[in-house]
Amino acid sequence: MKPQPTQPAASQRLLSLDALRGFDMLFIMGFATLVVNVCHIFPGDVSAAVAESMSHPAWHGFSHHDTIFPLFLFIAGISYPFSLAKQRSLGATQGDLYRKILKRGALLILFGLIYNGLFRLDWPMRTASVLGRIGLAWALAAMLFLNFRTRTRIGIVGAILVGYWSLLALVPAPDAPAGADVYSMEGTIVGYIDRLLLPGKLHNKIFDPEGLLSTVPAVATAMLGMLTGEFVRLSEQRLSGNRKALYIALAAVAFTLVGILWDLSFPINKKLWTSSFVCVVAGYSLGMFALFYWIIDVKGYKGWVLPFQVIGLNSITIYMAQRIVDFKGISAFFFGGLAAKMPEALAPVVASTGYLLVSWLFLYFLYKKRIFLKV
């Protein structure tokens, strides 16, 4: 049977987004560990490089693991124009839209605090979090998207990226050690703002990778996703799905090149969320979305999507569950005996495969029961 393309209506959910979100989250639910363990079986330069890409660089630099967080935020951005169109079609007022944005942002911040151990009552606790940054960056971007037209939104993204670069380059931390580089952990104004204003513990004592000032360029990441979603919503009469995918792919190349060139003066750094990092991960995110969108929504090849869709529809659930549910213990109960009988090199592969399978089956159970955590 020939695959059927399904161009989305103005407010329809994109299946490619659920699949891409699931692919992204797959790496934090055990797949990255599995890749590393498989690479250890086949020693060599290529395997070593692949394994290294499954972890974050110490400071400057870029790896695949650096793409997971910003891709999720970018996808949240793509979704918003579709959600906004649906809300407006149901008669939502401007006040309703503001309340929904604030509610979602606040819930994500709350989930971030819970993830960090809110209920342990161990004070002071770390208040910055991945979910908290998503909540703040997405909510601020949504407010801007709601109140400005496309050209102004693009201008805001440019102003954020150039302004952030200028600030970090020209304003070092007042308490920086003598000779400290303005882009170092000790010398950057980003860490100083965290030490001055961010309540609770900092992740690295003097710096937090999900701190306050570095959330500002993350707003640009979310906004770029929203601009992409707005572009995809253009009617088929104005622009075909094939052309949309092509233009998004070309934009991916352009952003990647800009990021690589910008790295010469403003290093690519996830922890600082530098403007060059924003551009490079925008390139990656646009490229991955173009691929998934073209295959799934334009060409209609959907038979392979379910494993990723199961994850993508409950992405916040699995993120929180990794912290709350003892998947490692459950996996050891079912797969520990088999892993123990494997050769030494294969045992970690069996264990990590079991962990990934248990995590996925948990989500599949929720999927079959139609239980989804919606924020």
Placement of each model-derived feature along the sequence:
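Alpha-helical transmembrane segments and their immediate juxtamembrane cytosolic regions
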Residues: M1-V375
